[in-house]
């Protein structure tokens, strides 16, 4: 399609704004702690929106509305599962992880935290977890770059090769320059843009059809199954869709936001903000797909692109219902969703290399400035590898991204959850949980037993592995138990205000 000047200008202004934030963050980045975790200085608002934006990729504005448009409201079970999982993660893990990482050598990364928490002198936990992060997040990054390239390709009529670099360049620049603060501040802007788009668009769709009741009648007339929450689903299918929520406990880029909060007491505010944002965004995405059924049913002449690819429902509605300036802002929300997740994943990969491999094994005495620049170079290296993988969007390696959410959820999720909740957990328990969870996901996905989403057995067996191997081996050292007790007491300490952190 021919790109309009207003849309092009809007995209360029947005991208320039993100890069400008990167330069502002650069001025506040004094050491490696600042570059990787923002000096643990994020307030509740930035913590909340950064966690949300880093979580919700382009799937929120393309995949979810497309699935609802194609199959009806029954596809919303995954949104319900994600909402529940995110809330439990905020409630049980967020504040505790913020405290425990600080009490365990001020850990900057998950591998660093595992090493300190379980006094792993062999550093096996650090190596395994860092390599798992590098493998899957590099592929994750490649997948995000493909999504950004597809957006530029379809919106601006670019070749895929040009779109590949155009889509990735801005994210790489502001992440390279500003590190964690740039990523978190841009996430906040991007999250605001996403919620604006997902509230405004379905409202205008409903108005365009003739109101809520009229829209619902049109949807029912097309197929009554569109409003059936149980359409084509059995108990296992519903549990599998809901099971996506288990992934939150083990996603390094989301957990990093908890670790970067200025205090565990501010987590309660952040939870309320983040969950409100998430519920509104998911409801908006579902509404875009759901009421899009009514709009395109009433306007079949406009439905060609959507009928060919249901994931374009948000894009087409934005271009049809709004003038090019507003449409440009709304379509920037898709780019925001892609960029916010990609930048977080690039930074997690960079920190895994710099903190958990370079500093831990090669340069223990490296200066803060050296680590910051190594971190920046690693952002660039990982990005270039991801771009190389994304150069062929049909690359089989990209298929491994389907393992990533379940893999992280099952391998890291139980370990993180038990590590902040159970003082009796040991290094062998952590290692067993990580390996059993990951292997279960891989094997279960290959054989597809019971048609059950592999994260569920992976999480269950990983948890059992933690408990069994922790109880079979030696008890944690006195120092480990004392450190856990101090961290737990600090977590439950009274906040400065009357608001309780629990």
Swiss-Prot record:
Source taxon at top rank: Bacteria
Bilayer-crossing regions: 6-26, 42-62, 68-88, 127-147, 163-183, 192-212, 235-255, 276-296, 320-340, 371-391, 398-418, 430-450, 452-472
Membrane topology: Multi-pass membrane protein
Induction: Expression may be repressed by PutA in the absence of proline.
Record InterPro entries: Na/Glc_symporter_sf, Na/Pro_symporter, Na/solute_symporter, Na/solute_symporter_CS, Sodium:Solute_Symporter
Subcellular localization, as worded in the UniProt entry: Cell inner membrane
Annotated positions for site Involved in high-affinity binding for sodium and proline: 344
GO MF entry, a single one: L-proline transmembrane transporter activity
Gene Ontology biological-process annotations: cellular response to proline; proline transport; transmembrane transport
Pfam family, one: SSF
UniProt catalytic activity: L-proline(in) + Na(+)(in) = L-proline(out) + Na(+)(out)
Gene Ontology CC: one annotated term: plasma membrane
Family: Belongs to the sodium:solute symporter (SSF) (TC 2.A.21) family.
Protein name according to UniProt: Sodium/proline symporter
């Amino acid at each position: 399609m021919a790109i309009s000047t207003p849309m092009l200008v809007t995209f360029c202004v947005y991208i320039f704004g993100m890069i400008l934030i990167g330069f502002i963050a650069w001025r506040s980045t004094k050491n490696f702690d600042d570059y990787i975790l923002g000096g643990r200085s994020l307030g509740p608002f930035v913590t909340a929106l950064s966690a949300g934006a880093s979580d919700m990729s382009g799937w929120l504005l393309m995949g979810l509305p497309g699935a609802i448009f194609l199959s009806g409201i029954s596809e919303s079970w995954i949104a319900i599962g994600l909402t529940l999982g995110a809330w439990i993660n905020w409630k049980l893990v967020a504040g505790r992880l913020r405290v425990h990482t600080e009490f365990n050598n001020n850990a900057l990364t998950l591998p660093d935290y595992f090493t300190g928490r379980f006094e792993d002198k062999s550093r096996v936990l650090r190596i395994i977890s860092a390599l798992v992060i590098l493998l899957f997040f590099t592929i994750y990054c490649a997948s995000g770059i493909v999504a950004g390239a597809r957006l530029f390709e379809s919106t601006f009529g670019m070749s895929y090769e040009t779109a590949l670099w155009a889509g990735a360049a801005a994210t790489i620049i502001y992440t390279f320059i500003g590190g964690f603060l740039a990523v978190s501040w841009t996430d906040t802007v991007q999250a605001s843009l996403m919620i604006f788009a997902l509230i405004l668009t379905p409202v205008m769709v409903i108005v365009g059809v003739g109101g809520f009741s009229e829209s619902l009648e049109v949807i029912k007339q097309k197929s009554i199954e569109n409003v059936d929450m149980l359409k084509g689903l059995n108990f296992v299918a519903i549990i599998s869709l809901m099971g996506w929520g288990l992934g939150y406990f083990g996603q390094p880029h989301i957990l990093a936001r908890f670790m970067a909060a200025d205090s565990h007491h501010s987590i309660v505010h952040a939870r309320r903000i983040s969950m409100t944002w998430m519920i509104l965004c998911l409801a908006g995405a579902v509404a875009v797909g759901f009421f899009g059924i009514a709009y395109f049913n009433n306007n079949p002449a406009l439905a060609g692109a959507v009928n060919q690819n249901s994931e374009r429902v948000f894009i087409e509605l934005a271009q049809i219902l709004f003038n090019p300036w507003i449409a440009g802002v709304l379509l920037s929300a898709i780019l925001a969703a892609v960029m916010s997740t990609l930048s977080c994943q690039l930074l997690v990969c960079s920190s895994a290399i710099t903190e958990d491999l370079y500093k831990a094994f090669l340069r223990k005495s490296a200066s803060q400035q050296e680590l910051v620049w190594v971190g920046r170079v690693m952002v660039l290296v990982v990005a270039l590898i991801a771009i190389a993988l994304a150069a062929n969007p049909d690359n089989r390696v990209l298929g491994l991204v389907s393992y990533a959410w379940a893999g992280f959820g099952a391998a890291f999720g139980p370990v993180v959850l038990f590590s902040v909740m159970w003082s009796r957990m040991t290094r062998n328990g952590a290692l067993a949980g990580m390996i059993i969870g990951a292997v279960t996901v891989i094997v279960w996905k290959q054989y597809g037993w019971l048609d059950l989403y592999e994260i569920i057995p992976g999480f269950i067996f990983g948890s059992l592995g933690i408990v069994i191997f922790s109880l079979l081996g030696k008890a944690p050292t006195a120092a480990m138990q004392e450190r856990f007790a101090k961290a737990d007491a600090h977590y439950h300490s009274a906040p400065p205000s009357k608001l309780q952190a629990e």
